[in-house]
Design a protein with these regions (language model features):
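Class I S-adenosyl-L-methionine-dependent methyltransferase catalytic core
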Residues: 1-175, 179-199
Length: 199
């Protein structure tokens, strides 16, 4: 089966994290705060990142995933879920997984955000429990990594998503639409499911 993991620049965050506004924090003076961000741009700078702040760019990606893949997962910011759900036709079966990130730092909101949703389309024939060797949960708690790439996912996150998709290295191919740090591709290359990775 053809599977895909899509971890695009998050809607409403792309220009700030990856584009020309990379050093403009919502806590910065431009937004009425006092935070100062300094340092060099991370390795994942893209001059056209702002196009991912437009919902139609995400819609085109969703349409591609639906037409080209048997199963897929889309990572997103907590405030993106409301925008994404209407992009997916009701006839397309999906699940929403939750990645809990226990060590997040305070942002501009009073309520601390500690999770990111992942929309998953589990391939046909892999949704029922019949004949399953593993039963992944739809939520997982995994610490973030700080490797210089904004939004990089830890290896265990990739394992969890692959487990939800029912990944079988003998018969499946997996595309990583946004290679970024290379962490997703590195985990896919291992090929063997770690049955205890995401509990």
């Amino acid at each position: 089966m053809r599977l895909c993991i899509a971890d695009p620049p998050y809607l409403g965050h792309a220009a700030i994290w990856y584009g020309s506004g990379m050093h403009v924090s919502k806590l910065s003076p431009e937004f009425g705060g006092t935070a100062r961000i300094s340092g060099v741009k991370p390795a994942d700078h893209h001059p056209d990142a702002a196009r991912w702040d437009i919902i139609d760019t995400h819609l085109a990606m969703v349409e591609r995933l639906i037409s080209d893949y048997d199963g897929w997962a889309i990572a997103m910011a907590h405030d993106n879920l409301r925008a994404y759900l209407p992009l997916i036709p009701a006839s397309v079966p999906i699940r929403v997984g939750i990645w809990n990130k226990p060590q997040n730092l305070p942002g501009g909101a009073r309520v601390l955000n500690t999770y990111e949703p992942v929309i998953v389309r589990i391939p046909e024939g892999r949704r029922a429990s019949t004949g399953c060797a593993i039963f992944p949960r739809d939520s997982v708690t995994i610490s973030r990594i700080n490797n210089g790439f904004p939004g990089a996912k830890p290896p265990t996150w990739t394992r969890w998503v692959l487990d939800m998709l029912g990944y079988d290295p003998e018969i499946d191919t997996v595309d990583d639409l946004f290679a970024g740090s290379g962490a997703v591709a590195a985990e896919i290359a291992q090929g063997v499911l770690d049955l205890g990775s995401a509990s």
